[in-house]
Curated annotation (Swiss-Prot):
Species this chain originates from: Lonomia obliqua
Domain of life: Eukaryota
The protein, known as: Unknown protein 3
Amino acid sequence: YEYSVYREIIGSGHIIAR
């Protein structure tokens, strides 16, 4: 998923995944 890339940046992931 696209958010998977951002998840690494945020660390939490659920924020973007949400």
